[in-house]
């Protein structure tokens, strides 16, 4: 599903954020991506989503070389990838339910199908009562859960999540991880970036550790 070959990412003359990273993630795997702040976790996820391009090296996602994608090829690839980044990127002029269902709308699903799937995801995350609210009326934690519901609604081939439980209490954290594990059991490849050591201890999965832009362990 994911292959990185000698990937380096640098900005200007600064030290590389990622340096000579080699990584392989098989289809259907669940992996933790961990390391201290500034280790390169978010940058790696952004490269996988084609939000940025590597300075050198090659990246394959779903068998496609992202370095060689045309301008039209990036949106096509992203149809099979869902992301949860720390800035959430909710649409301010759309309701919560419309935000969640946006990926299905892009795929051409019917209004009834979109509404039903969106409400089910919101119900799983305790946000059914907020379905017709605008994002500005929600707390930061609620907005975070909306972003997670949006990422899961279309059952993507690949889910990339950057600190998806960072601002949530233990109960909500467990609920969200159950949803991520369920998506993984259904075939979604899941990559979750976190610096929460307690999560890694409680939910043991393959863990790739970064430090100063390099992979220092993979177990």
How would you name each of these model-derived features?
Residues 155:
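Conserved catalytic motifs of ABC-family nucleotide-binding domains
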Residues 159-162:
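Catalytic Walker B motif of ABC-type/P-loop ATPase nucleotide-binding domains
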Residues 97-105, 115:
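Short helical segment in ABC ATPase nucleotide-binding domains corresponding to the A-loop/adjacent helical element
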Residues 12-13, 66-82, 183-185:
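ABC ATPase NBD coupling module
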Residues 57-65:
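Conserved ABC transporter NBD signature motif
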Residues 49:
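Helix-to-loop junction immediately C-terminal to a conserved catalytic motif
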Residues 134-138, 142:
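Conserved ABC ATPase signature
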């Amino acid at each position: 599903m994911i292959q990185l070959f000698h990937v380096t990412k640098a900005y200007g003359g600064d030290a590389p954020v990622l340096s000579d990273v080699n990584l392989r993630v098989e289809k259907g795997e669940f992996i933790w991506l961990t390391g201290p702040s500034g280790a390169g976790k978010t940058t790696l996820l952004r490269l996988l989503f084609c939000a940025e391009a590597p300075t050198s090296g090659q990246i394959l996602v779903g068998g496609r070389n992202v370095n060689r994608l045309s301008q039209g090829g990036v949106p096509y690839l992203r149809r099979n990838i869902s992301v949860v980044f720390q800035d959430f990127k909710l649409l301010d002029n759309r309701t919560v339910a419309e935000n969640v269902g946006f990926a299905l709308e892009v795929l051409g699903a019917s209004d009834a199908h979109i509404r039903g799937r969106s409400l089910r995801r919101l119900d799983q995350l305790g946000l059914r009562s907020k379905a017709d609210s605008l994002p500005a009326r929600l707390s930061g934690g609620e907005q975070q859960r909306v972003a997670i519901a949006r990422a899961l609604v279309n059952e993507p081939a690949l889910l990339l999540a950057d600190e998806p439980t960072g601002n949530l209490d233990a109960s909500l954290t467990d609920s969200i991880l159950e949803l991520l594990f369920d998506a993984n059991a259904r075939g979604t490849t899941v990559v979750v970036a976190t610096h929460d050591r307690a999560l890694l201890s409680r939910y043991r999965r393959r863990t790739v550790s970064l430090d100063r832009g390099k992979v220092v362990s993979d177990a």
